[in-house]
Amino acid sequence: MEIRRADKDDLDDFVRVYVESYRGLEDYAYTRKRDVKNYFKWLLSRDKDGVMVAEIDGEAVGFVACDTNWFSIFERKKVGEIHELFVLPEFRGEGIGAKLMEKALEYALERNRKVAELWVGRTNYRARRFYASQDLRRPESGGSGSE
């Protein structure tokens, strides 16, 4: 597996992997491809170096987006905001998500962000178990439907 910085040429792969990864979790995802494309462009515009793709044999199987320009209302400073982390269902359980998270957190530290944040849907149980397995601590709940 190789993890590299994503760029605008990864748009179609991002859309494909995103849609497949969020199947069954549409309450937490964009459902129209046009919206997913705009979301990818927005992620790149926020922090182009923080968007990374995991590839196996040249095929995109997962993405992570770490935004080090994000101002946290909780921390009252810029943090490494993990906007996205997803892996194709057939590649889950192989450590790809953990490696993507590791790379995102390394990137945040390189940018002098000592705190990382993310939001996860309350009923996205697979993601919640994954983040718990990564020893991420759970802060106070915020918003409705997400933490």
UniProtKB/Swiss-Prot annotation:
Gene3D superfamilies: 3.40.630.30. Pfam families: Acetyltransf_1. Residues 1-147 form the N-acetyltransferase domain. InterPro entries: Acyl_CoA_acyltransferase (IPR016181), Bact_Acetyltransf (IPR050832), GNAT_dom (IPR000182). It is an enzyme of class 2 (transferase). Keywords: Acyltransferase, Transferase. The keyword Acyltransferase applies. GO terms for molecular function: acyltransferase activity, transferring groups other than amino-acyl groups. It comes from the Archaea. Coiled coil: none annotated. Its EC number is 2.3.1.-. Belongs to the acetyltransferase family. This is Uncharacterized N-acetyltransferase AF_0521.
